[in-house]
From Swiss-Prot:
The lineage of its organism: Eukaryota, Fungi, Dikarya, Ascomycota, Pezizomycotina. Residues 13-28, 61-72, 118-130 have a biased composition (Basic and acidic residues). Residues 1-145, 292-318 are annotated as: Disordered. GO terms for biological process: mRNA processing. A zinc finger (C3H1-type) spans 155-179, 200-221. It catalyses: 5,6-dihydrouridine(47) in tRNA + NAD(+) = uridine(47) in tRNA + NADH + H(+); 5,6-dihydrouridine(47) in tRNA + NADP(+) = uridine(47) in tRNA + NADPH + H(+); a 5,6-dihydrouridine in mRNA + NAD(+) = a uridine in mRNA + NADH + H(+); a 5,6-dihydrouridine in mRNA + NADP(+) = a uridine in mRNA + NADPH + H(+). Keywords: Cytoplasm, Flavoprotein, FMN, Metal-binding, mRNA processing, NAD, NADP, Nucleus, Oxidoreductase, Repeat, tRNA processing, Zinc, Zinc-finger. The gene is dus3. This is tRNA-dihydrouridine(47) synthase [NAD(P)(+)]. It comes from the Eukaryota. PROSITE patterns: UPF0034 (PS01136). Catalyzes the synthesis of dihydrouridine, a modified base found in the D-loop of most tRNAs. Specifically modifies U47 in cytoplasmic tRNAs. Catalyzes the synthesis of dihydrouridine in some mRNAs, thereby affecting their translation. It comes from Sclerotinia sclerotiorum (strain ATCC 18683 / 1980 / Ss-1) (White mold). Gene3D superfamilies: Aldolase class I.
Amino acid sequence: MTDEIPNPVQPEKSLKRPLDGEQLEEAHPPQPILPEDSAVTKAEKVERNGANGNSVSNEEPVAKRIKTEEQNHNSTATDSRDRVRGIAPIKAEYLLHPAGSRSATDGRNPAANDDAAEEKPRGDNRDNGGKKKKKEKGQNKDRQFGSWGDKIKLCNSTSNSPEFSPKECSFGESCKCEHDLRKYLAEGKRGDLTTFNSKCPVWEDNGTCLAGWKCRFVGSHSKEVKREDGRMELVLIEDLERMRTTVAGDEEALGGVVNVVSTKDKLDLARRRTKMEKSDLYTNWLDKNSEEVNRQSNLRKDQKNDQTQEEKEENRARYVEPPFLPSEKRRIYFGPETPVLAPLTTQGNLPFRRLCVELGAQLTYSEMAMSIPLFQGQKSEWALMKAHESEITPPRINPDRSSIVQNYNNSKDLKFGTQISANKPFQAIKAAEILSRFVPHLRVIDLNCGCPIELVYRQGAGSALLDAPSKLEKMIRGMNAVSGEVPITAKIRMGTMTGKPTALKTIERLAFGGVESRERLGAPGCAAITLHGRSRQQRYTKNADWSYIAECAALVKSYNQKKDDLTDTIMEPDARTLPNAPDGKLHFIGNGDCYSHVDYLDHIQNASVDSVMVARGALIKPWLFEEIEKGQTLDKSASERLQYIEKFARYGLEAWGSDEMGVGQTRRFLLEWLSFAHRYVPAGILEHLPPSLQDRPPAYRGRNDLETLLASDNYMDWMKICEMFLGPAHEGFKFQPKHKSNSYEIEAEG
């Protein structure tokens, strides 16, 4: 199976799994490779897991580094009230062990290893003592993970049709699926779920259910009717008044889902029938222009000085203008009233974003998509572009703010943007063109320049772009040229190496362009920059450096003045080369460790950022956006938190379907979310506020049994929570938490 998974960054290079070496403690256990995984997720899993499912690393385990740092942190107190750094200050009556006892220290929950959620560096031949790896044979050599589905597969020609009038099966007599509906219902699928009052959430919302007879709630929208000949026929029920009109005839658009790309468009991309004239023209010009720039830069200084005026004029004449200028962009706005939900791999799925928008998130991003699979038409990558209709509504703004962009029209703005990754300019440029063409509801296209994942970094994408500023500028400039009215933004880190920040230079380049291109081409056109206050090397260890973010914010604030200084006094810059023209405002967003409204306000006021992007804080408590809006800490009860989990389950069934596959998919992503959400410590049992994202609690009990259950770090308890809304797991279902070396495998029923 792994041989069929392409490299999403560089297709010409095959993915290699690490060799079997010494058995190590797993920091990130094997994850199942599923068809619906995005390209980068599939590739990560291939490179991360050994032949026997064992991770191999040539670096010191991240968990060990974290433990060492915590020991150093815990040795000092942060205030006069003996608040110990790194330990959540829980009131004494809720502690399971007396304060100061050894049990109190031993009973602390283990540190959540957020680095384990990222890929571990792969090993090499030395990890296996130089021995040649024995190649496994057979098509099922990687079938070590769980799966879920119906025992008997019902043919699609029957799945949504009345019993006596199915559609014509395109496979005819050679079809291997079941066509006997009653046999399928009796033997092929599990019984109906009794959750959600035994009513199908999809049918309740749309008046129809796309899963048809495969639905785990099919009894709520089907009946048996008597025909004239006396036979009893099974039929599906539809509520015509509640049925929604699908977009472009695509059934996937039900349930308030937008940005659904048609199967025809994806097939045209896969078969290279889609023309990308703008991208081809621009990349051809870019290649020729780069050759001339390289030729000039390779001249020795004395050669340049010896050039005659005529030779200099001839060199200038060799430069060819770009084939076209960018279109003027839609104005966008970031402000204190627009907190941003970060692009979250795996966790940033549509149901979770929908929940966050409901709780006050004003701007959202898709999960990071790889550029090559996008313009190759891969279904799993285009699925990341789907958004809920609540994400295409305008963000909430304060119209009285003096910093608001000139000519900004809030009614034309929306919340949802997408993020892509690429390691070559042509990849990013092509992806930007097809996204602006096929995705109608798109606020921005963000280029990821901060992803620390080893697979992405090693091949020149993600945070590796921070060490290739010229290439990064070409990407932004090219994307800006072909994206129509959709603005281009970038998300960066402080740098790749700890103690050697490069973000100031990167920001200056994104704002003005490099010295070699600034005079001829103007600004690259980056509309906004988000800075994560850590280096790639730090990953998620140590606190985000907001003092450095503030230093970068000061540079961005001087952007307009410096832009005027660099502008020729005779010629005004072309508005099409500037973000948010006519004033050319560059927005700046900070990112890192925001976990309360106090953190948010502090960063806005003291770091002088336009807005703050929230990541792990929102995963642990998605009502953080509500706290920011109200300006207070909210002590959510256990029942309220359970309602959010129920909403996620409902939204998941609406997004992924209510059949066995959809229920399993919803269960999987709900468990992924609970692996973060269980870290929340209720505000009402803390001695000190605001809470810190880096604090971990000692062993404690909640104010009631449900609160204690929600705080459990045992994945079996997470399974119990899921079963409240999704019923018992399929016998083949497995779950392996990202942050722990354990897994769940349900015992066979009966």
